């Protein structure tokens, strides 16, 4: 009888140990340091830590690919000590010189990054960039700006993706895709599984001297179709980083309020997106 009881306890322990809670699925909130462009690297670290943002995409002013190796490693050690991850950097504009572009990949490898946000101005650069993607096994994410920019129209991006390595994908700037006149939810859907990064940004179109101008707003208060986008995120099971970013000089002067409100909005939108596995 005793042996049977012990056997039952062992079985129960094994059963419940297998039902450990997995990390929540769904997107993760991050920070694009263009938002903190008036800060130093150390100030960015303090800001991100204070606001609980662990996934950081850096601009060169804070983490420079051209810096000496020792300097990059020093900064990486600081990030590690604060529990922060430099998951990407950009937006970079690589050109036709493959060996010059190699420096970006070497830097990403050194920092442990899995994706680089890029916006090459010459479409011919994709030949050498694809070779580097295959060599380093590091993803490239095409960033979009306004409609007049090289990748402002998703149709241009789709042409690049069509015959390129699957590790070449998209960094979807939600604010700019909206300002360019596209529905962020539809664009996300149409890109399929090629979205590797997103910039959490919002813009509204206003008229200034008879011209339409895109103006940054708090996240969720502009023209971006966030309800539709998060519905698509839930449907697809996308689990990348949505990095808070603003182009507004006013917001960048003191981004704390923007970031705090973005977190509230993000949490509300993802409340029904994230799920917890039980096996």
Language-model segments: what does each one mean?
Residues 40, 71, 100, 124-125, ...:
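Residue-level preference for nonpolar/small residues embedded in alpha-helices
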Residues 34-38, 61-65, 91-96, 121-123, ...:
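Solvent-exposed loop/turn segments at secondary-structure junctions
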Residues 43, 62, 78-169, 179, ...:
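Active-site acidic/histidine proton-transfer and metal-coordination neighborhood
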Residues 7-9, 80, 250, 279:
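Composition-driven detection of intrinsically disordered, low-complexity segments
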Residues 2, 18-115, 149, 193, ...:
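N-terminal pre-domain/capping segments
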Residues 7-17:
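Bacterial N-terminal signal peptides
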Residues 21-29, 37-52, 153-172, 178-279:
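Histidine-acidic metal/acid-base catalytic patches
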């Amino acid at each position: 009888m005793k042996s049977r009881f012990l056997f039952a306890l062992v079985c129960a322990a094994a059963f419940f140990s297998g039902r450990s809670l997995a990390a929540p699925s769904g997107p993760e909130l991050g920070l694009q340091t263009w938002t903190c462009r008036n800060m130093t690297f150390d100030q960015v670290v303090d800001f991100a830590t204070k606001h609980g943002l662990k996934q950081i995409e850096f601009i060169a002013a804070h983490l420079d690919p051209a810096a000496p190796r020792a300097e990059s490693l020093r900064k990486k050690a600081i990030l590690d000590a604060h529990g922060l991850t430099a998951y990407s950097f950009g937006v970079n504009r690589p050109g036709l010189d493959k060996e010059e572009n190699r420096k970006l990949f070497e830097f990403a490898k050194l920092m442990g990054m899995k994706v680089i946000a890029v916006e090459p101005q010459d479409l011919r650069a994709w030949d050498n960039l694809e070779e580097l993607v295959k060599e380093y096994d590091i993803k490239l994410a095409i960033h979009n700006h306004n409609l007049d920019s090289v990748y402002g129209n998703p149709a241009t991006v789709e042409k690049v993706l069509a015959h390129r390595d699957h590790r070449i994908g998209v960094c979807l700037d939600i604010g700019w895709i909206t300002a360019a006149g596209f529905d962020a939810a539809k664009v996300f859907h149409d890109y399929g599984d090629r979205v590797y990064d997103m910039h959490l940004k919002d813009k509204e179109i206003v008229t200034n001297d008879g011209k339409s101008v895109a103006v940054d707003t708090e996240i969720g208060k502009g023209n971006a179709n966030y309800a539709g986008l998060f519905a698509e995120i839930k449907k697809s099971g996308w689990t990348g980083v949505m990095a808070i970013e603003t182009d507004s000089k006013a917001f960048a002067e003191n981004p704390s309020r923007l970031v705090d409100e973005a977190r509230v909005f993000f949490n509300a939108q993802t409340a029904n997106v994230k799920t917890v596995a039980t096996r």
